[in-house]
């Protein structure tokens, strides 16, 4: 029996965009469950009892409750951690200096991650727009000339799809198989764009907190 005109609600649980991409082949523009894990010093893990999976940056760029708590405790002198531990675990700021230190450390860590990535967010945006406009093999083969920073990635895609021997000027349309590969490539770029945006939003968030806590100097 088939029922028509009924709304169907699908629930994918608390998957991040990377997990959705791996398991279902799509991502969400605004996924409240998306998150970014940043590398942490071993002492950060050992100085608190928060599980590793709770130490991340939210989709909106804000550090998780657990990550902030762990960083505040880690930034506290070891001889004071026991007395201030209950405040850190309750989500309270321990001091202005401590909070500024935590925000500076987090922003620097995010900035380092972004700098070590092979492409910039602006380059990914341009590449994504260009891929969406591709209609034939000539346009695809010309991409490597336009996007120097993504040349290796583009060449890898061309080689993986056995297109390296296609002559320029052939005006051949993309095969169904190549288009499917391009769709997957498109999704991969979308994912890394959102990954980078979370890191950038975290830097902005940390900068705002630092500005709000820093003493204001007014002209005489």
What are these regions (language model features)?
Residues 19, 24-220:
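Charged low-complexity "KEKE/polyampholyte" interaction tracts
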Residues 1-7, 208, 215:
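Conserved AWS/pre-SET-to-SET junction and N-terminal core of the SET lysine methyltransferase domain
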Residues 2, 8-18:
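Short, charged beta-turn/beta-strand-edge "cap" motif at the junction between a beta-strand
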